[in-house]
Amino acid sequence: MSNAEDHAGTRRDFLYYATAGAGAVATGAAVWPLINQMNPSADVQALASIFVDVSSVEPGVQLTVKFLGKPIFIRRRTEADIELGRSVQLGQLVDTNARNANIDAGAEATDQNRTLDEAGEWLVMWGVCTHLGCVPIGGVSGDFGGWFCPCHGSHYDSAGRIRKGPAPENLPIPLAKFIDETTIQLG
């Protein structure tokens, strides 16, 4: 038996392993970009959460900010707004679901379930009409002291609940919380 015959199997095995390794590396290099493109882009990640300074917002004033490409209405409500919102019975509402991402999904659309704080002073919601996506007019507009969508005539009350018109749902409440007394985090 010659020395060459002893090593013939090992050379062949080496070629198999080298080919398999090169194939695995090539497959990984081809698959990696396909998997990586499913991750959110840097601009989307940067907008996943924003902080809004509300220290200069007086009672009765609305602040509109852009979040994830859509308007967010932040209103510091007056005592009259709060009383008006709390006087509404659930039976008077078109949509009795609170649509508040901060509480249970099936919560009722009471005024307390729609506001950011216990006192009911701060209302934060998406500023997009639930009918066809127009931006409602704020500043105590419409028949119910809240917002009015001029596109098709939807009226929202002082808690952003649909009261009249073709819109099927209340204006939704995004994930939001107070970080401190003057800063709200969205997202």
From Swiss-Prot:
S-S pairs: 134-151
Reaction equation(s) it catalyzes: a quinol + 2 Fe(III)-[cytochrome c](out) = a quinone + 2 Fe(II)-[cytochrome c](out) + 2 H(+)(out)
A GO MF label: metal ion binding
Entry's transmembrane regions: 15-35
Keywords (A to Z) from UniProt: 2Fe-2S, Cell membrane, Disulfide bond, Electron transport, Iron, Iron-sulfur, Membrane, Metal-binding, Translocase, Transmembrane, Transmembrane helix, Transport
Cofactor note text: Binds 1 [2Fe-2S] cluster per subunit.
Entry EC number(s): 7.1.1.8
Membrane topology: Single-pass membrane protein
Primary location group: membrane
Domain Rieske: 89-185
Necessary cofactors: [2Fe-2S] cluster
Localization (cell): Cell membrane
Top-level lineage group: Bacteria
Recorded GO CC terms: plasma membrane
Residues that, per the record, bind [2Fe-2S] cluster: 129, 131, 149, 152
Top EC category: translocase
More details: The Rieske protein is a high potential 2Fe-2S protein.
Function: Component of the ubiquinol-cytochrome c reductase complex (complex III or cytochrome b-c1 complex), which is a respiratory chain that generates an electrochemical potential coupled to ATP synthesis.
Subunit relationships: The main subunits of complex b-c1 are: cytochrome b, cytochrome c1 and the Rieske protein.
Sequence similarity: Belongs to the Rieske iron-sulfur protein family.
Record-given protein name: Ubiquinol-cytochrome c reductase iron-sulfur subunit
Originating species: Cereibacter sphaeroides (Rhodobacter sphaeroides)
